[in-house]
Amino acid sequence: MRPLTEEETKTMFEKLSKYIGENIKLLVDRPDGTYCFRLHNDRVYYMSERILKLATNIARQKLVSVGTCFGKFTKTSKFRLHITALDFLAPYAKFKVWVKPGAEQSFLYGNHVLKSGLGRITENTAQYQGVVVYSMADVPLGFGVAAKSTQECRRVDPMSIVVFHQADVGEFIRNEDSLT
């Protein structure tokens, strides 16, 4: 387990800023202590410094996971967010999409959000902006990328994709072996 390099930090923060903007600083400097990001086996973990100090007593080969996995770096050095980061991203999300109850199950099975399943969308959402997807009861379901801007969503046909799926809470069941 090691700190992220300058390039890795830049790549990860660029990805996070698509979803939570400048609220990234609220993840690190929290009122309940200082938190940090650490890299272990190409995965980025988010943990308090107290847990980090305790984890240094464990050998690197024996350490499976520590803290919350925020995502992983691919072989091409791109950062991919994991669904385990949803609980930390949802409160700070700048742009949100609410899906109708009928479209929730489709999204949780890994499908994109169609215009017919769109309940609400945050004003001034740009095209290809990172969004957090909520149910109509304000329960975070996952995150994705807006396929259309807010203005385009108003006049598009009902079968058009408005949010590209990236991750959802259904992945806990579908990919339980690979989520650590």
UniProtKB/Swiss-Prot annotation:
Disulfide bonds, paired cysteine numbers: none
Q: Where is this region: C-terminal domain?
A: 93-180
Q: Give the InterPro entries listed for this entry.
A: NIP7_N, Nip7_N_euk, PUA, PUA-like_sf, PUA_sf, Ribosomal_synth_fac_NIP7, UPF0113_PUA
Q: Does the keyword Nucleus apply?
A: yes
Q: Where in the cell is it found?
A: Nucleus, Nucleolus
Query: Is RNA-binding given among the entry's keywords?
Result: yes
Q: Region (N-terminal domain) spans which residues?
A: 1-92
Q: Which GO terms describe its cellular component?
A: nucleolus
Q: Which CDD domains match?
A: Nip7_N_euk (cd21146), PUA_Nip7-like (cd21151)
Pfam families the record matches: pre-PUA_NIP7 (PF17833), UPF0113 (PF03657)
- Mainly resides where? nucleus
Which GO-annotated molecular functions does the record name?
A: RNA binding
Listed under GO biological process in this entry are: ribosome assembly
Q: Which UniProt keywords apply?
A: Nucleus, Ribosome biogenesis, RNA-binding
List, for all copies, the residue spans of the domain called PUA. 94-170
- Name the Gene3D superfamilies on file: 3.10.450.220, PUA domain (2.30.130.10)
Question: In UniProt terms, what function does this protein have?
Answer: Required for proper 34S pre-rRNA processing and 60S ribosome subunit assembly.
- PANTHER family per record: CYCLIN-DEPENDENT KINASES REGULATORY SUBUNIT/60S RIBOSOME SUBUNIT BIOGENESIS PROTEIN NIP7 (PTHR23415)
Q: Give the family, as the similarity comment puts it.
A: Belongs to the NIP7 family.
Q: Describe, as the record does, how this protein assembles with itself and its partners.
A: Monomer. Interacts with pre-ribosome complex. May bind to RNA. Interacts with NOL8. Interacts with FTSJ3.
- Protein name, please? 60S ribosome subunit biogenesis protein NIP7 homolog
Say which species the protein is native to.
Tetraodon nigroviridis
What gene is this protein translated from? nip7
